Amino acid sequence: MTEPLETELYLSSEKDELFEKGPWPKPFAFNAEVVKVFDNMVCRSVPLYREVVAGAVHWTRAYYQPKTRIIDIGCSTGTFLELLGRFLKQPAILVGIDNSSDMLDKAKEKLAQVEQIHQIELICESAENCSFEKSSVVVMNYTLQFLSLPQRQKLLRAIYQGLVPGGLLFISEKIRSDCPQFQETITHHYEAFKAKNGYAQNEIERKKEALENVLIPLSEAEQLQMLKQSGFSYIESLIKLHNFVSFVAFKSD
């Protein structure tokens, strides 16, 4: 019988009003002001965010191999690692990578209790400069989309090479449709989702403008192709709503 997972996330309660009151970052960057409200921002901006984090924990537990590492690329404030640390019974090496020192400061606070059970390593570095050797699970949620296309393929290949046989990549990304009419409808529903979560239209427009040429989404087919070209033998889409999707990719040998 599958053990139930407590999915109550450890999140900061500070409300995201960054694009209402300003000064808002343009172009968008994960600076100290964004970090303060990041937990609230991501929950109100990413559909099914809690389900994605919980799903990543379930898949990590299923594919984790003892004496290997679990790596979270773009770990931000440590929400996934904190939930995983509560759920994973055996001591493990949990690695969080982020190029924002402010994010890692928040993650360190959030992981204080988890650190009593697991070995925690927080690395302030760009993912493309990191090693993924001896990892059985790599999680990368909403991170690859901020890199250039050549960097994305290079990073995915490095992850594949670093994973042990039987290892897993859990990856979530914002995507776009190849069909202009579909994309228009998706955008309409996504902005309605954000409005329902309390964002005013001017906030939505300001953030969209700040993210222009910073977050560059690919189509779902392009995402799958990049994963295949990196060497992954089996790939499945798990969670999808509006213009966000999560995949699992398996390394068989």
Curated annotation (Swiss-Prot):
Species name: Trichodesmium erythraeum (strain IMS101)
Q: Which family does it belong to?
A: Belongs to the class I-like SAM-binding methyltransferase superfamily. Cx-SAM synthase family.
The upper taxonomy is: Bacteria, Bacillati, Cyanobacteriota, Cyanophyceae, Oscillatoriophycideae
Could you tell me which InterPro entries the record lists for this protein?
A: CmoA, Methyltransf_25, SAM-dependent_MTases_sf
What GO biological process term is on the record, naming one? Answer: tRNA wobble uridine modification
| Pfam families in alphabetical order | Methyltransf_25
* Molecular function, one GO term: S-adenosyl-L-methionine binding
Q: What is this protein called?
A: Carboxy-S-adenosyl-L-methionine synthase
What's the Enzyme Commission number for this chain?
A: 2.1.3.-
